[in-house]
Amino acid sequence: MERTDAERLLKRQQDYFSTGKTLPVEARKAALRRLAAAIDTFEEKLVAALRADLGKSRSESYMCEIGLVKSELSYMLRHVARFAREKRVPTPLAQYVSRSFEKPSPYGCVLIMSPWNYPFLLTIDPLVDAIAAGNTTVVKPSAYAPHTAAAMTEMLESCFSPEFVAVVNGGRAENTCLLGLDFDYIFFTGRKTVGWVVYQEPEEQLRPPTLEVRGN
């Protein structure tokens, strides 16, 4: 992907987020239901892809990846309304005549970068939470699980428009390109060396990351 293409994609997502269409709880639930239906439709293809990439059996693919994502979807569908609700909080003494509230708000445009070892779980599980929180998302699967990346791309393109959820495939060049863009939040799972790069980038651009790193 060329940088101009990545910038254009992010701009489309920023414009879509600015419309407020991702914010209503019912819109979030509808998106989660579309994702759940797509997973059911593509389950056989996902199982075959996980076997091709990692040699995982059907039972391992379901217990360690697909089933866990379905569980997260079910949980979020039950609780997203409560998570998004405005909450009353204590008011500081100096503002005693006022009432104080805490209102959860999405970050905006989120980048999810996932590893090869649990390529479905560690891509789609954080996507579920990003959607439930009201964000738009760019997903970057690992290049080292190409069959699973292709299956996830087909699945996500079947249920979401790219201004809401988009998939970028590729290797280090695409990683570098995406990390240079002004995402509002980054969720990264992978090697410590890459995680350190992800950590340093937000320091310059004032954006928060979530990092799950391992080894070198």
Language model: regions and residue ranges:
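Alpha-helical structural signal in soluble globular domains
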Residues: 36-38, 49, 70-72, 76-77, ...
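Short alpha-helical
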Residues: 41, 45, 68, 118, ...
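Conserved NAD(P)+-binding/catalytic subdomain of aldehyde/semialdehyde dehydrogenases
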Residues: 109, 159-216
